[in-house]
Amino acid sequence: MTAIGEVENPTVVQRPTEASKVKEQAPATDKKPRAPKEKKPKSAKAVTHPPYFQMIKEALLALNEKGGSSPYAVAKYMEDKHKDELPANFRKILGLQLKNSAAKGKLIKIKASYKLSEAGKKETTTKTSTKKLPKADSKKKPRSTRATATAAKKTEVPKKAKATPKPKKVGAKRTRKSTPAKAKQPKSIKSPAAKRAKKIAV
């Protein structure tokens, strides 16, 4: 019950202002979404085997079949020789390489077999010859420069050693010869004059 003259305070409902809305939304915006972890690319294995065409050529020359060698025979030879170096899917890559080489004229396709063409034989020989030449030149050059440098050092050292002791010996000999010659002359001149003076006085 309320007293007379007292009025009940009606409950005031506050409407949310724009400032309060911003405050409510602010903490939500502060939270940064977690960036997805970037997947590190798997490091590709270093290729240790020689180029496919070179391996194909080696297989065809080793098999030496007149009608050409089949892809299976080439793959078997490559697997026996480069087993640890070849990838798991090397047979698929070999099939593509055989087709591409035949299209370029490096290989001759006879039914289901492949044979080396003259162009394919020449290409590999020129590549190997050009690769070997720069290595030989690079090895020879530093040896010649080292030999000239050592020869120049050897020639310089004896010249300096011979030049220094010569003037000392010559100077010492000249001084020794000149001093006794001057000392002997006055003694020989004075001795006969003194004897003559004594004789005249007597």
Swiss-Prot record:
GO MF, one example: structural constituent of chromatin
UniProt KW keywords: Chromosome, DNA-binding, Nucleus, Stress response
Gene3D superfamilies according to UniProt: Winged helix-like DNA-binding domain superfamily/Winged helix DNA-binding domain
Top-level taxon in the UniProt lineage: Eukaryota
Biological-process GO terms, alphabetical: chromosome condensation; negative regulation of DNA recombination; nucleosome assembly
Biased composition annotated in UniProt, kind: Basic and acidic residues: 18-38
Keyword rRNA-binding appears in the UniProt entry: no
Transmembrane region(s): none
InterPro entries in alphabetical order: H1/H5 (IPR005819), Histone_H1/H5_H15 (IPR005818), WH-like_DNA-bd_sf (IPR036388), WH_DNA-bd_sf (IPR036390)
Biased composition (Basic residues): 160-202
Domain spans labelled H15: 48-118
Phosphoprotein in keyword set: no
Compartmental location: Nucleus; Chromosome
PROSITE patterns (UniProt xref): H15
Chief subcellular location: nucleus
GO cellular component: nucleosome; nucleus
Spans annotated as Disordered: 1-50, 114-202
Induction annotation: By abscisic acid (ABA) and drought stress.
Role this protein plays: Histones H1 are necessary for the condensation of nucleosome chains into higher-order structures.
Record family assignment: Belongs to the histone H1/H5 family.
Protein's UniProt name: Histone H1
